């Protein structure tokens, strides 16, 4: 088996396990994918979502930051990190991320507008 086949196999298995809500097993598959392909942006994104579901905020943030290092224009990672910062009452960082998202948004423009209102409302409290 060549490594190209193994890479996509691990990623696909991770997605299937994630869809079945087998998060620990999915996490392992995405980590295997990263061993073969350290720049697997989507694997890090899936890991961030898994850590969100497992309420491991530090690991979620770590993986979102990695996604953004690999692809500074990944709208989903920027949005999710802005939401994470908002949940921890870091309004300033959330606003900075949301402004960044608004400058590049393509798929997340509606969510960007909703998040802007949410940040403004929560930061007034």
Residue ranges and their predicted role:
Residues 95-125:
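Terminal, low-structured helical/coil segments at or just beyond the last alpha-helical repeat
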Residues 46, 80, 114-118:
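Canonical tetratricopeptide repeat
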Residues 19-20, 53-54, 87-88, 104, ...:
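Register position in tetratricopeptide repeats
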Residues 32-33, 66-67, 100-101:
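Canonical positions in the second alpha-helix
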């Amino acid at each position: 088996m060549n490594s190209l086949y193994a890479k996509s196999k691990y990623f696909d298995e991770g997605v299937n396990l994630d869809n079945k809500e087998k998060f620990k097993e999915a996490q392992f598959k995405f980590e295997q994918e990263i061993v073969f392909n350290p720049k697997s942006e989507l694997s890090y994104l899936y890991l961030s979502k898994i850590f969100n579901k497992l309420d491991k905020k530090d690991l979620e943030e770590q993986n979102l930051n990695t996604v953004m290092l690999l692809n500074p224009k990944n709208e989903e990672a920027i949005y999710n990190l802005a939401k994470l910062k908002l949940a921890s009452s870091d309004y300033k960082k959330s606003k900075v991320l949301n402004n960044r998202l608004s400058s590049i948004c393509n798929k997340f423009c509606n969510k960007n507008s909703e998040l802007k209102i949410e940040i403004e409302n929560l930061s007034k409290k």
